[in-house]
Amino acid sequence: MRENKENDARYDLIVIGGGPAGLTAAIYAVRSGLNTLLIEKGICGGFLNEIPRIENYPGFKQISGMELASRLKEHAADYVEIREIEEVLRLSQHRGSNQKSSDSFSSSADFIVQTTKQSYVAKALIICTGTRHRKLGVVGEDEFLGKGVSYCATCDGFFFKNKRVIVVGGGDSAATQALFLKNMGCDVTIVHRRDSLRAGKYLQRMIDRAEIPILWNSEVKEIKGSDRVECVVITERGNEREIPVDGVFVAIGEVPNSELASHLNIECDDSGYIVTDRNQRTNVERVYAAGDVSGGVRQVIVACAEGAVAAMSAYEDITSEP
């Protein structure tokens, strides 16, 4: 049972983020005996909720991302307290009375987690905050968000049935979204800035079979319209032209949600991903990171594995303290 002191709920471990890494970490942590809380700013599942079909997660020949997310959450909820729609605003570390403000973070001090609802205290933290969609950064992108511009075909594809859409990008996400939209009955074209796709060969073959056209060596420079998207400005090998479209689906990668790392001086790489060792430990004692926020191979099964490793490392470090 958790204790209360000075109105702060106290835990052994707080997991921040309810994607595959966070949910798995929470399961492993509680099963090892750690009093654990999971905090998720939205709903559990993360990007899983946007994946229309998964065919490489062991145990399921085919499953939707939303269904897998639901099963992971249901499993975790049997073990751990989950608080959704609660965003972590600030991380800090309590200093003992004999510690000077200039001292580095103490290895024995508790962490204070301040959210939109209350504050919590924990002996250890696992950061599993994932990533967010990278933006094109062009005129009209923000203006028409929700009015023709989208980052999630699974979420918004239904509204574009029998309409003209483009998918911007050349990786697995772009290919998957294009195929989903094609199956929804959309008139789909892929716009890619290079002369070949980065998506896996299996997805490329599916794109070919679906006869989805691709504009090679092309970039979106502007999104235009009145109340909704009406066309995009494309540059292809220096030549500029307008293409009439009803929807623009952006799939050009992700940016790590690692802003909380700066609160504790947690090391990040040049791209903003949290740096960890092979046991998911960061440079700050009793702080761990797992899943997409720590970079590496961004796959669901890898995120789950990293979450499990992080929880085991946390258990080892907490129980080894005198």
Language-model features, listed with the residues they occupy:
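Glycine/small-residue-rich loop that forms an oxyanion/phosphate-binding "nest" at active or ligand-binding sites
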Residues: 82-94, 111-115, 119-159
